[in-house]
Amino acid sequence: MSHAPIQTAALSWNEQGTPVSKQFDDVYFSNQDGLEETRYVFLKGNRLPSRFAEHPRPLFIVAETGFGTGLNFLTLWQAFADFHATTPDATLQRLHFISFEKFPLLQADLAAAHARWPELAPYADELRAQWPLPLPGCHRLLLAEGRITLDLWFGDVNELLPHFDASMHRQIDAWFLDGFAPSKNPDMWTEQLFAAMARFARPGGSLATFTAAGFVRRGLQQAGFEVIKSKGFGQKREMLIGELPADAPAVAHPTPWLLRPAADNTDDIAIIGGGVASALTALALLRRGAKVTLYCADPQAAEGASGNRQGALYPLLNGRGDALENFFSAAFLFARRQYDALLKQGVTFDHQWCGVSQLAYDEKSAGKIANMLAVEWPQQLAVAADRTTLSALCGIDSGFGGINYPQGGWLCPAELTRNAIALAQHQGLSCHYESDVKALTATDSGWQLSFNQEETRQHATVILANGHRLGELAPSEALPVYAVRGQVSHIPTTPALSELKQVLCYDGYLTPVNANNQQHCIGASYQRGETATEYREEEQQDNRARLLRCLPEQSWPAQVDVSGQHARCGVRSATRDHLPMIGAVPDYQATLTQYQHLQRQHQRGEAIANAPSYPNLFVIGALGSRGLCSAPLAAEILAAQLFGEPLPGDADMLAALNPNRMWVRKLLKGRAV
């Protein structure tokens, strides 16, 4: 997907106080009464909220073209909140709203527009508090304590739709076909859009739009909708409403070798692990109503790679606009929203959103940073900074310029993990510590978990979140992941080091002082293939030496004192392409057998079977050294997959996270795995 910068909306305000788009010379909503127009056209036109009471599933999914001021979304949110308050035990428990916006509004303009509707203020305030940066792609916002999911896709809807993942097929219960009038914005109202709407609509799904233009009606009908004219709002004579026939056929998966199956049973899910990925996955599943059990091999959570005192949080950028960059930029913004939400829920952990500075300390690092900055990033995400600027930001002179991440910072992974699990337990999570799963055996009803001394346990669905120990269980032993030992040094602060105000990244990292223990963290060693966790003096010294080597002209690094031998070692799990593995556990032997002629089948357009995987066995792993950045979005992706929901990412990103990706890439090229 293109990484072209997103242009924000340019507004003027007419005599009625209605916002007008300068790009399209059209109002965002009716001068007469925008709120009532929304209720009439989009809610009543889709028989909402009356359909909520009869909805047979826990989730109702709405998609919209043209988010604008968010009026349609806020109005629907209000209606859903009223429904939930009066009918708390209904089958329907959550609302998922998907919307596209080519020119997102600035927060200040949103606030001015929202001031028109005081009754929507509680919802509008919460929306603006999470309003994302203008970055292309999907921004998932979790609102109303998780009952509302908002996917904001920034970019041109017709450019985004071809990159959508098949998880959207036959999902949408109601379409809000909105946007500026066809006469003002003809590029949006295309046959491609109408076809995608039909492809994504659930059989029996509805649509409504304010326009009655003939080419729109014909285009929707040609795409497969049954469309009729209805009385328009106010002085408008007509509008269109419609439905996709209940017998609409299923949509074929365009890339079956990347199929992401849902779980057959979400009422009984076991997670094997005890780190940050386990904690956040448990919360994502519980939010959806799952029953979840955690099995941790250690006496308490966060004894492994998630047990450090301070970990840096910042995006991984490269300037290439590839899946790696797209994932980590989206993951970083989602992580900040999630961590802020957890803090508001009472999940405490040491942290400072103090910013992160990455140094151009040599020719190679300067080249990498130059590539990153070739992209026009929002300045709140990443910005170039010369030596003087970085020195002012960091409070200490490094001797170099580089790139600054204003919304980055550090947090305590151990406290985050343990306290997030405590919150999950309050929400119903069952935890079993010192429960080391030694074997997984498929049964007719799911999976049998075997331990050394405990009785076996049965669960319908299992998630592997056991870090570098993935290879110890037979179904996942073939996954191409590897262990990386890392030792982090804990050093006492000094008057000079205490001046450091941001996380400093070079060929290593140094954190600001943690006021609660008067120590910094400096690290980390990188020993591929090693799983031993004993203290090593040579790695302790190397952590210090790398700082001195990268900042040779500065005197303050010499104050770093590692002589106390205070350190912690963890073992990460990583992949060659630096991306996590999120999804169903692939069956290695079945993949080789079933796809031995995949290249030829694909080239000839032959039917290709779905990717073979172990039923109801999933993995979230290989988070490497950036688990604090990737774990929240990874957990959300996996939970959405298990529940068969739309996923927060485009097809290229999701393909790059699929656990079978490395095998399939080779097989598609006719190469041996």
Curated annotation (Swiss-Prot):
This is tRNA 5-methylaminomethyl-2-thiouridine biosynthesis bifunctional protein MnmC. Its cofactor is FAD. The lineage of its organism: Bacteria, Pseudomonadati, Pseudomonadota, Gammaproteobacteria, Enterobacterales. GO terms for cellular component: cytoplasm. SUPFAM superfamilies: FAD/NAD(P)-binding domain, S-adenosyl-L-methionine-dependent methyltransferases. In the N-terminal section; belongs to the methyltransferase superfamily. tRNA (mnm(5)s(2)U34)-methyltransferase family. In the C-terminal section; belongs to the DAO family. The keyword Translocase does not apply. Residues 1-245 are annotated as: tRNA (mnm(5)s(2)U34)-methyltransferase. It is found in: Cytoplasm. Its EC number is 2.1.1.61, 1.5.-.-. One of its GO terms (biological process) is tRNA wobble uridine modification. Its main location: cytoplasm. It catalyses: 5-aminomethyl-2-thiouridine(34) in tRNA + S-adenosyl-L-methionine = 5-methylaminomethyl-2-thiouridine(34) in tRNA + S-adenosyl-L-homocysteine + H(+). Catalyzes the last two steps in the biosynthesis of 5-methylaminomethyl-2-thiouridine (mnm(5)s(2)U) at the wobble position (U34) in tRNA. Catalyzes the FAD-dependent demodification of cmnm(5)s(2)U34 to nm(5)s(2)U34, followed by the transfer of a methyl group from S-adenosyl-L-methionine to nm(5)s(2)U34, to form mnm(5)s(2)U34. Keywords: Cytoplasm, FAD, Flavoprotein, Methyltransferase, Multifunctional enzyme, Oxidoreductase, S-adenosyl-L-methionine, Transferase, tRNA processing. Residues 272-673 are annotated as: FAD-dependent cmnm(5)s(2)U34 oxidoreductase. GO terms for molecular function: flavin adenine dinucleotide binding; oxidoreductase activity, acting on the CH-NH group of donors; tRNA (5-methylaminomethyl-2-thiouridylate)(34)-methyltransferase activity. The keyword Membrane does not apply.
